[in-house]
């Protein structure tokens, strides 16, 4: 396993603009690797996620940024490719693309987006991945007669680096698509604690069927909680029905992370702080991350 990566999840609330700028600088100074930002364009109090990322990359020099996850039905793949490549160039190669098929169909339709069945949603994501890769190879004229994202255009610009496409997949068809075509899995909070191993196996089987090495696919575990001085935790970190936030000491936090990394091959941790404070960032960065990285290094030795 490569060195564990750690990120922080942000809410793009319009009322918090000043704090968001300061907060990402604190995240970077604390040593985190990336920031992920939820993308729900139909939430009135939220800023546009991509516009916010474009602003925050200018406040940082090292952090990577990723929508968690881009609402594909409201962001056509053709323009998503252009926006993503632009952000990657503007940031010097610090942008990755998380994609979601869409769930809140009433709200999506309310903004003029389509309603899609589960099967249609998977097909649309598959088609979008092909369009994204085509648009990121510059200097060509591409014609694709897709059902969801038809393309007849000159391609480009090329991003600064090979942008990873990470999916927030839940169902078996989407997990299979991920293993076949995508670069990473952002395990949704709705994926139950006990369901994660089976989901991993589905991804692995699809990857092998496509001639890919399952180990090449990144896996992100999302953990909600607070670092405390009380040695209490739950055997069911917050995911799916019955899950709970993790509220415990740094050593138990590190133990939970190590179990996900060693037992289920998650290589990236997305922290969703219950309290988005400087002190919580400091505690996680200085007391949890070193323990977790040391433990996973020992497991691989």
Identify what each model region corresponds to:
Residues 6-10, 35-37, 64-68, 95-99, ...:
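Hydrophobic faces of well-ordered beta-strands that scaffold small-molecule active sites
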Residues 27, 31, 56, 87, ...:
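Conserved, mostly hydrophobic/aromatic
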Residues 1-60, 163, 274-277, 287:
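N-terminal beta1-alpha1-beta2 module of alpha/beta enzyme domains
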Residues 6-18, 70-78, 159-170, 237-252:
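Active-site mouth loops of central-metabolism enzymes
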Residues 2-15, 73-143, 188-197:
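Flexible, glycine-rich active-site loops centered on histidine and acidic residues
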Residues 47-70, 124-131, 209, 214, ...:
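Alpha-helix-loop-beta-strand connector modules within alpha/beta enzyme cores
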Residues 1-12, 103-109, 143-163, 220-242:
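N-terminal small/glycine-rich loop or linker at the start of catalytic domains
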Residues 15-27, 79-83, 167-177, 248-262:
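Short, acidic/polar
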